[in-house]
Amino acid sequence: MPATFGIVDLFSGPGGLGEGFASLDLSGHAPFKIGISVEKEASAHRTLTLRAFLRAHQARHGTLPQAFIDFHAGLIPEPGWSEVDAAAWRHATAEAQCLELGTEPAAAAIDHAIGALRRDFDDTILIGGPPCQAYSLVGRARAKGKVGYVPEEDERHYLFRDYIRVLDRLRPAAFVMENVKGMLSSTVESRLVFEMLMEDLASLGTGQGHHYEMRAIRVADSRASLQEAAQPSDFIVRAEEFGVPQRRHRVIIVGIRSDLADRATGTSIPVSGVARAVDDAIGTMPDENGGGKFVHGSGGLVLLRAA
């Protein structure tokens, strides 16, 4: 039977990275299940919880709840989701935690989740990316304009260590860490933050078992694969190389536990590689002010326009 991996998602935001993992379907098998996601910002956490609810409902019933479709079509006000599907809502509120990493409540919740993940899944994966404001070029420019700002006193520079503490506790099969490109040039204590991060990652497993081998996602000949990085910039992933109509560049580090690293060697997946314009992706979406409503059709949701 194919392996199933339990996911720990840190600094989750509204859950985009976790949604990508959870949505993967391999011939009817979903290899990734989110065990816990952690986000401290309230509005992002609301979206995170709703997405967890929708996944749980769809797993139980095979479709999205009609109330969700009607709500987004403007036909009804937002319902109480616990009344729509109480079991799915309980699952969602247990999965999506509104907590701040580095605090005792967060540590207790993550430790509890780790125990369940080890019991219920073949192995685990850690995903997430520390908040980027301290590393982004815009964030750094704003910080310079603040009177009395001292980078060494900005805790956001060191949030990656909360990620590493969980990584050390979980010891997953693999991890994925994402951040803005500015992380490569951001400095604190007269050192590059990226250099500090890589040193901390490399120290895991020293003298106590398996370490992690860091890999970069590289695209060549319309195929993506995990490769050793010769330089920090190799970790930059360019969205347009994957057919995304956006020039969004992000640093993504993939770490593979050393006892599994050989399995990733020589493996690749096809990618689009075709440049797409925004109109290619959303040109068929309905006009926001065009009226009409959504109904179920043979190919999914269909917009019925008013005459």
What are these regions (language model features)?
Residues 2-12, 16-171, 181-195:
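Core alpha/beta nucleotide-donor-binding catalytic domains of modification enzymes
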Residues 116-120, 133, 137-307:
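Class I S-adenosyl-L-methionine
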